[in-house]
Amino acid sequence: LMTDQVWHDDPKRLLFLLSRYKFVAKMLSGKEDVLEIGCGDAFGSRIVHQEVKKLTVADFDPIFIDDIRSRMEKDWHYEAKVHDILCGPVGRKFDAIYSLDVLEHISKDSEAIYIENMLASLSDHGVLIIGTPSIQSQAYATPQSVEGHVNCKDHAELKELMQRYFHNVFLFSMNDEVVHTG
């Protein structure tokens, strides 16, 4: 659904999307039980699925989850569930959670709920990866993207937010499909 529109509007953006999923897959390789929050149509989720034992994808929109289930292949089976992370934790603990391109759509007033509900769904020694465009990137974003991005941050703001919840915070940047530490 979403990815088809991306292919129509800006095909090179698919490279950026898939690069993010490849990064997550490498970071979470070997994890037992992984959750994606805000999966949309789950187009890139299969890349992560190759590297982890069990994957669950969740989105608040049942249209996406119904579409994912209708396209599910036997050899690529994973759980797809309707869940709004702003309404509560998922209900069980995961080794790792990732959420790509979600935070920027959540109001600043709700960002603590978003993070706290993911934390409540994360095992004590679990890993959380959050991917979000920087405020600086908005100068290059499409008008449609900018319209929905209500909570973009710079590196310092994102790090400060994450340090409220985590002892260890590592920030990465991305230009086109290249991930780096700058």
Model-derived features: positions:
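Conserved N-terminal segment of class I S-adenosyl-L-methionine
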Residues: L1-Y98, D109-E116, N151-E157, M174-D176
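Hydrophobic C-terminal alpha-helix "anchor/cap" residues
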Residues: L28, M162-Q163
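A generic structural signal for alpha->beta connector loops
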Residues: V52, D75-H77, H125, Y165-N168
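Short aromatic-enriched loop/helix-cap "lid" or pocket-rim segments at secondary-structure transitions
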Residues: F94, A139-Q144, T181-G182
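Short catalytic micro-motifs in class I SAM-dependent methyltransferases
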Residues: D101-H105
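Short glycine-dipeptide loop
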Residues: L122-L128
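Short, glycine-/aromatic-enriched active-site segment of Class I SAM-dependent methyltransferases
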Residues: I130-V150
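Conserved S-adenosyl-L-methionine
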Residues: F166-V179
